């Protein structure tokens, strides 16, 4: 998947002065990705197997579907909470 970041050779690209904007966009894409994961896991049939990838490796281990679903929902909630905090900070900066 191609990255959405700018390359050093792109000198004509305008860089926003607000540091939270790139983080906010990154969070937004992670939230979309996590929503898809939750949706896919929740729509699986009961007899389907789910595998978890070992971090920094190409090894996959069998995982419990319900545990993976609840873990994915928790991650989604945390991402949404962090995104909301950034939104609130942006709103307070605008008011000042």
UniProtKB/Swiss-Prot annotation:
SUPFAM superfamilies linked: Prefoldin (SSF46579)
Feature: compositional bias, Basic and acidic residues = 1-10
- In this chain, the stretch annotated as Disordered covers 1-28
Keyword annotations for this protein, in alphabetical order, are: Coiled coil, Cytoplasm
What domain of life does the native source organism fall in? Eukaryota
Task: Tell me the GO BP annotations in alphabetical order.
Answer: protein stabilization
Entry GO CC:
cytoplasm; RPAP3/R2TP/prefoldin-like complex
Positions in coiled-coil regions: 23-96
List the subcellular locations.
Answer: Cytoplasm
What binding partners and quaternary form does the record give? Component of the PAQosome complex which is responsible for the biogenesis of several protein complexes and which consists of R2TP complex members RUVBL1, RUVBL2, RPAP3 and PIH1D1, URI complex members PFDN2, PFDN6, PDRG1, UXT and URI1 as well as ASDURF, POLR2E and DNAAF10/WDR92.
What name has this protein been given in UniProt?
ASNSD1 upstream open reading frame protein
Q: Which organism is it from?
A: Homo sapiens
